[in-house]
Structure formats: C-alpha cells, structure tokens
Swiss-Prot record:
This is Putative pre-16S rRNA nuclease. GO terms for biological process: rRNA 5'-end processing. It comes from Parasynechococcus marenigrum (strain WH8102). Belongs to the YqgF nuclease family. It is an enzyme of class 3 (hydrolase). It comes from the Bacteria. CDD domains: YqgF (cd16964). Its EC number is 3.1.-.-. It holds the Pfam family RuvX. PANTHER family: POLYNUCLEOTIDYL TRANSFERASE, RIBONUCLEASE H-LIKE SUPERFAMILY PROTEIN. SUPFAM superfamilies: Ribonuclease H-like. InterPro entries: RNaseH-like_sf, YqgF, YqgF/RNaseH-like_dom, YqgF/RNaseH-like_dom_sf.
Amino acid sequence: MPRPCSVLSLDVGRKRIGLAGCDPLGITVTPIKALHRGRFDDDLPVLQQLCQDRRVQGLVVGLPLDAAGQPTAQADHCLRYGRRLAQALQLPLAWVNEHSSTWAAGERHGLKGDRSGRLDSAAAALLLDQWLREGPDLKPVQGLLGGAGAELVDGGS
C-alpha cells in the first residue's frame, strides 16, 4: 500500500482527460471536472494550477492494457503524456492498468455513453481508489523513462 498523500489521477484520452484527486490522507477520492484536451502546452497550465491548488504530491496515470495485459494502441500515447506531464510538474508518478475502468465507471454511476467528461473523471476516480489500495509507490519520472516498469497495478475491475 502506498504512503498516503494528495494525488491527482488521470484517465488520458484523445479528447478529454478524466481527473480525480484524493485528500492528503488518502481517505476521500473525488472526481474533478474533466479537462477537454488541447495541445500539451495548452493542457499544462490548467494541470499546473490544479496541482498547485490541491497541493498534489504525485500523479497516477491510467495505462490502457488489454485483457491479456498487453499495451493497447492508446498505451503509448498515455505513457508519453504521463511522463511528459510528470517531468513538467516535477512530480513522481505511478501507472495503473485501466483495463475496463471506463466500463466499470459507466456501470457503477449510470454514465454509459456520457460525453460530458463525467465518465472519464469517474474512471479516474476508480483508478485512484485502486492505487490507494494496492500501489505501486510513486516513482520519480527519471526512473520510469525506459517503460511502464514492472510495478503496475492490474486494476480496472
């Protein structure tokens, strides 16, 4: 189980980034309004301000793997985005397997087919819940540049 701290969870998509945060003790997970994507340079100031306002100490990024645990077409994009964001924000990061997280969030919250971003942020909240229960520990981005690493939560429900 990771050390509790204020963390921002991201469910990175091509059009939106679902966001969720937790309190510094890791007790309460809260979905945050999804970010409608632009270029990375447009997203960064919004995420910087959010991290500053919430006193974020680490990032949890969903990594889309298939049912066999293999990277999907979207996984490479998420890896690049997560690393780039962690480096820009100078925050440690952990990856969580997001297989089925969007489906599970849709089922749990009745948000199937939602395009407002609520579904994306509900999925980010599920990822953060899973990370708080199972880890892995946050790592400096420099330690993750070679790949997603062996420490990956096999989450998603």
